[in-house]
């Protein structure tokens, strides 16, 4: 029986990334809370931080290898969103008028959040049992990179760097899904076919940008 450890670790990193993005949505007034469609479902779901105050997200130092440019140290009293995730620092919720660019940014962020939620759900409910029955490759480093990109994204307010980080998160998430599909493609069982179909549906919701 194959060890589920790489898949479990990948899910853990993805959930930290998801919690960071959900907190970012909520602090900007863009999220509907843990029960929103973007929230992972199932008994293994780790809810986002319950106590929070309006603020900007900043990553902690020491996110681990692959952290891309996390700047600054957490200030006293920051709220940890998740272990290795981001901290919440005071920042006003009023971010100005809702321009077309901001609407597009909100839509792109929501797409990444929803797709990450669906990926975690598929991994927990479908891929976990399959990994125990028959081994398939899991590329853990991609999930670590995704987590670090999302943590760096949370440092940004708006502008070109935010857009670049959001696009990087989008592309990294697509890479994770594509590699899982490739890993499952040559496995013959009906369960693997169902899992591949679910992953392809996620991929369809992540068009090229």
From Swiss-Prot:
Disulfide bonds: none annotated. Signal peptide: none annotated. Residues 28-87 are annotated as: Disordered. It comes from the Eukaryota. InterPro entries: DLEU7 (IPR031510). This is Leukemia-associated protein 7 homolog.
């Amino acid at each position: 029986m194959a060890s589920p450890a790489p898949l479990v670790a990948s899910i853990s990193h993805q959930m930290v990334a998801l919690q960071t993005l959900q907190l970012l949505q909520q602090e900007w007034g863009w999220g509907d809370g843990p029960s929103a469609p973007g929230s992972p479902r199932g008994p293994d779901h780790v809810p986002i931080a319950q106590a929070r105050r309006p603020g900007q997200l900043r990553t902690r130092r020491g996110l681990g290898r692959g952290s891309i440019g996390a700047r600054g140290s957490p200030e006293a009293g920051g709220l940890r969103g998740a272990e290795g995730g981001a901290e919440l620092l005071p920042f006003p919720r009023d971010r100005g008028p809702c321009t077309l660019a901001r609407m597009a940014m909100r839509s792109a962020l929501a797409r990444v959040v929803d797709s990450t939620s669906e990926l975690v759900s598929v991994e927990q409910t479908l891929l976990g049992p399959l990994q125990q029955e028959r081994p398939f490759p899991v590329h853990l480093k991609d999930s670590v990179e995704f987590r670090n990109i999302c943590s760096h994204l949370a440092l940004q307010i708006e502008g070109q760097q935010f857009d670049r980080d959001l696009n990087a998160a989008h592309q990294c998430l697509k890479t994770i899904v594509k590699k899982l599909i490739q890993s499952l493609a040559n496995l013959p069982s009906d369960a693997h076919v169902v899992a591949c179909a679910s992953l392809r549906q996620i991929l369809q919701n992540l068009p090229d940008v």
